[in-house]
Each structure stands twice: as C-alpha cells, then as structure tokens.
C-alpha cells in the first residue's frame, strides 16, 4: 500500500539555534524538536533519563488511601488477594505487587483470570474466587477501572477493593449501559465515573498527570514505591524495574516521560540478568548478549509471556518471574515456548479464515469480522495484522451462541475507544485505550453495530486518514550519514511508540546493482554524487519495477551499522522509495 510522505519542517535558523543551545547536530536538533522538546531542561531529561525524574507516587489519586488500607491489612493479618490480568503487562504488574507485599512481610495471594473460564478483567467470578480464599482486601492491577458490578458485589460481600489500573475510565457525559450501578453506587471525579472502590489509583483520572501514560506495570511500580516510602525506604527500583520495563514495552505505551526511564534502566537490568526466570526465558528465546532493544523483546520474550494467557492459564508466568530456582525457571520457560508455538498455529488458522470472510464481505471504512469458533485468545493479534495490512480500524468477534466477544485495533487517525463509546448502546461491555479495546455484545446486534461503527468513522475520518503515513524526521544527504551521527542517535534510545527510530529522507539517488534477495527483500547500493552506501528493503521486492523504470529515486530509511565477520559499515534500512521528484 502506498504511503503518504510527510516531512517535518522547521525554520532553519531555529534549528541552528536549538542545535547550538543543546550541543547537538542540526539533524538531531530537528528530531528533538519533532519529539516536542523545547527547553534545554527537557532535552537533558529526554537524552539522560534517570530515577530523579520519577514523580511522587503519592501524587496519584487515592494512593495515600491505598497505602493506608494495605498497612491496616498487614496489621490485622488480613488475607490480601492481588488480582491481575493474563497479558504481559498484567502479569508483570501482578508480580511487582506480590513481590513488594512479600518483601514488606505482608501475606498475600494472587489470582489471574482464565480467559476461557472467567473472561477479561475484574468480574463477579473474581469476587467469588476472593470469597472462596477468604480475602478481605482485593488489589487489582491492570484492570478494574470499569468493573462497576464486581466492585458493588465485593462491597456486599464485605471485601474492600483497591483498583490500580491505567485503562480509560468511563466518561460521565456518556449514557450508562444496562447493568451499570446507579449513581448512588458510583463516585464522580472530574469528567469520569468510577467504581465505588475503597481506592482508585489510575493516572488517567488526572488531566495533567506526568504519569498519565504509565502501563499497568508502571502503576504497579508506583504502588510498590509508595508502600516502601511508607515504611521509610525509597530505593527499591532495582527490585522491580526489569518487570516494569517488560510490561511497559508489552503494552506499547508511549516511551516518553517516566516510561522512558523505566524502559532504559529496565532493559539494562534484563540484559545483565538478575531475574532467574527472565534468564531462562532469554535462553529459550535465543537471546544473547547484554544489549537489548524493545523491538527484540516484543518479538521474542513477550510473545512467550503472553502465550499461556491467550490459550490456557497464565499462573505459571508469575511463578517464572518470581522463582530463584534455575530448574523450575527452565521448565516453565520451555513450557511457555511450547504454548507460543501452539498460539502461532491457532493464530494463523484464524487469520486465514478472517481474510476469507473479508474477501467475501469487501473492505469497509471500519472492518468488522465475526465467526463461530474463532479462538478468543488470538483475535486481538489477528485484528492488529488486518488493521496494519488494510489501514482500517478492525474488530474481530468470536461468536458463542447469543454472545460475541471481540478485540478492536485502530489506525493512528481514530480513537477507537471514542468510536466504541459512540456505539455503546449496542454493547454489553467494553474497555481499553485509544488504539486497542475489548468488547462484548449480543450476536444478533452485530449487523447494526457494524453499520453504526461505519457511520461514525465516515463522519470522523477523511479518505486521507486511511492512507498510512511516513513521518520523515529530516532530509539528509548521503554524505552526512556517518558513524558519528549514529552514535548521536543512540542517545535517543530506547525507541518505541512516541519515540520512533529516526526516519530520514534523501532525494535524487542513483540505484546501483539492485536485486531481490531472500523472501521478497530488495538489496542495492545507493549513490549520491561521490557517496555510495548499501541499502536493504525488507519485504520491498514489489518496488523492483519502480527501480527498473526510474533513472533516480527518492528514499525513506533508517541508517544502521551492519556488523559482519568483525567488520562494521554503514547501511540503510529502506522503508519506502519512489521515482525521484528531482529528475
């Protein structure tokens, strides 16, 4: 699919001023400006994140109440149940809170819902489980912010609930779905309606919180930090940053602000191997070396952590992340590897079936696909793949009798949580973020729901919004692609959502020795005046015809250092190319 080429442009005089003020190159200055940085203090914090930049955990709403209630539970010897979620963010968040409580001598147990048996989130089934275990206090992590019924049931059972979550709260101005408790059972804070829990700790309740983009594991880290401060100890990050980094990367939250520090320091901890379970998982995933990047974890360790929660039971992941036994860790890691292979098989089957349904229905502004028997554990991944392929928001629904449960994935131009909110009369329940959500509705309502979503999207988006865009950070001549520049780019790491790897563009390039290699990849040399550099375009073999019919090309790329047999040379990772506009 062709993409829009959008070049960020700034007044050259301001770039020169900014570069001099911050002692960086003009290209890095342009990138930092693109990232929204304005002052030397902001630049310094971005390039050199450290723990001093962490905000006070007690600035989060209800944190003081939460800590006091946990302290009371400890003093009374109450049974505390930590209720997590079955994805990597929820599992790492659960491990953080359980580990913190045990380090403080507070007895606790944990519960991870089974996707098939219990469904998603904090539910009535969760309350029944807490009652069975004799818990008088439930701490939710990475879930609970829209669990009105479960919180109300907990109160009736005499069980207090502390919610720690980072998902979107329910907005007051939206009409309430059937089954939502009355206003007397709810608490209103700012523009949101919250469950009537003992405490609700969620940075999204605050409009201007510096912690607003924390993952579930990030919020759990804040709770752990607050608990230790309450006990007179503040330096506890070394116990939890590796887990918090994993959860942050897994949930694809912006790697800016506090998340940047969490991931940067956490990656270093993961790389140097202090967690027995993660060491085993790295070995099974084939990860070597101490220098890790988020992308490597996203495609190796994290899918294995996610796998059991998708197709079976995720409790063993907590054991893996908590154990000091190398034998136990390796046994669990090998089992996770098997689970991931099975997940891949199931996912591919559902993906191919979904493509068949899409071919029969045709592409609409908002793609909604449904069928009986699709495995609920993989429909989120399938939705992501179809959304990326067709540049459309996508919902994949698994139908079981009268009920359909699904996962939604969006494109950058659409807030999918807003779109679902506009159609909430069709839904039994839903929750999530701007780019991803989960939902449930009656099977018979699917056609009307699909029609409603498409009307919403047509009103909100233009044709251009459905065309994926390449946001080019800066134009560059090949003579300026250097080892020194790439060394400077290292200061921008870690890369991820909100801080992508720098994307550069160059014009009027001669193509030398272009050929297709491997499974649909494009390899060549690019020449500009006297400068020649190797280039590789993964999955870009379809551009071969463009190269053969063009005298010169324009290219978008990320530069990198190719290391092979002890040698290092500069190369370009091509993202797109076109006939040159300067021919």
Language-model-derived ranges and their functions:
Residues 474-533:
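Accessory interdomain/linker segments of ATP-dependent helicases and helicase-like nucleic-acid enzymes
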Residues 2, 8-137, 157-158, 173-178, ...:
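Hydrophobic helix-and-loop "lid/oligomerization" segment in the mid-to-C-terminal part
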Residues 404, 437, 520-524, 568-570:
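Short beta-strand micro-motifs in enzyme catalytic cores
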Residues 128-174, 191-217, 221-230, 239, ...:
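Active-site cavity-forming subdomains of large catalytic enzyme subunits
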Residues 530-546:
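Beta-strand/loop nucleic-acid-binding surfaces
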Residues 71-72, 188-202, 526-531:
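Acidic-glycine-rich active-site phosphate/pyrophosphate-binding loop
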Residues 445-450, 543, 549-583:
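OB-fold single-stranded nucleic acid-binding module
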Residues 476-478, 493, 539, 559-561, ...:
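Beta-strand elements of well-folded, non-transmembrane domains
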